[in-house]
């Protein structure tokens, strides 16, 4: 039976060109370095250590060049524990310990980091101009070999800063780990299969106005893409009441409700877009002057001017770097009833952080496409919000 729906091949729309020397090169000549990230064990980090980890990330981001994208992708996939009984010298107690957890369900966590060098024009593009809708033109800026060399040097310095912190370990992914081999599926193939294991077969991707499917799995997407959706105050960590007492605190990261505390198959994506901070601040200065001129016609314009002025005052007085950011949770299930429960769980976890949960159905295909390893530069600019990165020497 012929498929009457409008269809195309993945090859014709695939945004990546090649993998060379451990870097992913897109058809728009964006260069991406990929890492596997080893994070501290949950429930073992103190409040002071969370502050130190946050400061280390800020220091590392500062060394990246303008028009770079940091994409941190945390995978949480339901699996069942399989004991390793083939180790040599295993005694009775060790074997009993392994068998005690046999087939016990758990949430498998993998963390990846993608650092992308793109161009000014690419960072400004919106969802109606991504690689799902157009062809490819290589920007003149990215053709300069010196640009690529400086970016790789910055990436190495970035990794060194995080590895020297003692809390986070980065391991550069090889070409085979990115593209895969005859025996192992690479992370790009795993993303299209929504699986951390080897993909047995290729899955069809269906995009409709109501939902998006990858094989039998239906996707649901919740986004944090506006400052109005964020809580009034954000911290590096929070108290976990279930394991805390009057005398001791158990600390978790502020975003832990979207990580291991969310018991479903999901990916937590975090994006930081690093542009030219001085240009961004000058653009805000111009916007503030326009709002001042229009304030007599609308009180909302006057309020917006005050917010922009406060943002500029903070940035200039404290030496903050202007960046854009976006966060989303992409969950999936092959069962329609379970997906309804997952939607409620994700929304309630976001609400527990003080955020306004936004179930985004319109941009799910576009954001799924931008989440492809090495394709973060294809992210739609209108889905991000402006914020600041601490730029002081003790950050």
In which residue ranges do the predicted regions lie?
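Extended, folded cores of ATP/NTP-driven motor/assembly subunits in large transport
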Residues: 1-390
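Conserved small/polar residues in nucleotide/adenosyl-binding loops
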Residues: 391-395
């Amino acid at each position: 039976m012929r498929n009457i729906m409008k269809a195309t091949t993945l090859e014709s729309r695939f945004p990546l060109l090649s993998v060379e020397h451990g870097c992913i090169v897109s058809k728009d000549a964006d260069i991406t370095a990929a890492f596997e990230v080893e994070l501290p064990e949950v429930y073992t980090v103190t409040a002071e250590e969370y502050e130190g980890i946050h400061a280390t990330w800020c220091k590392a981001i500062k060394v990246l060049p303008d028009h770079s994208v940091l994409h941190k992708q945390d995978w949480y996939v339901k699996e069942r524990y399989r004991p390793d009984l083939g180790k040599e010298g295993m005694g009775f107690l060790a074997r009993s310990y392994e068998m005690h957890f046999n087939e016990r369900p758990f949430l498998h966590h993998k963390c990846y980091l993608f650092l992308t060098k793109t161009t000014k024009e690419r960072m400004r593009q919106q969802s109606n101009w991504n690689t799902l809708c157009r062809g490819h033109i290589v920007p003149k800026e990215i053709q300069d070999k010196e640009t690529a060399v400086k970016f790789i040097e910055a990436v190495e310095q970035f990794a060194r800063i995080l590895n020297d912190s003692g809390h986070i370990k980065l391991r550069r992914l090889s070409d085979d780990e990115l593209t895969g081999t005859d025996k192992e599926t690479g992370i790009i193939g795993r993303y299209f299969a929504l699986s951390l294991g080897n993909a047995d077969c290729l899955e069809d991707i269906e995009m409709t106005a109501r939902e998006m499917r990858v094989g039998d799995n239906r996707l649901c997407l919740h986004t944090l893409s506006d400052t109005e959706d964020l809580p009034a105050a954000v911290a590096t960590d929070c108290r976990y009441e279930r394991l805390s007492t009057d005398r001791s605190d158990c600390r978790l990261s502020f975003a832990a409700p979207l990580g291991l505390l969310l018991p479903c198959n999901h990916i937590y994506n975090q994006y930081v877009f690093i542009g030219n901070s001085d240009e961004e601040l000058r653009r805000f200065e111009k916007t503030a002057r326009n709002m001042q001129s229009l304030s007599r016609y609308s009180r909302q314009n006057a309020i917006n001017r005050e917010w922009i002025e406060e943002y500029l005052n903070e940035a200039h007085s404290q030496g903050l770097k202007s960046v854009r950011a976006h966060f989303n949770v992409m969950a999936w299930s092959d069962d329609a009833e379970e997906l309804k429960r997952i939607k409620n769980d994700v929304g309630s976890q976001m609400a527990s952080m003080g955020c306004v949960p936004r179930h985004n159905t319109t941009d799910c295909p576009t954001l799924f496409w931008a989440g492809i390893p090495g394709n973060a530069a294809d992210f739609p600019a209108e889905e991000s919000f402006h914020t600041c990165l601490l730029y002081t020497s003790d950050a």
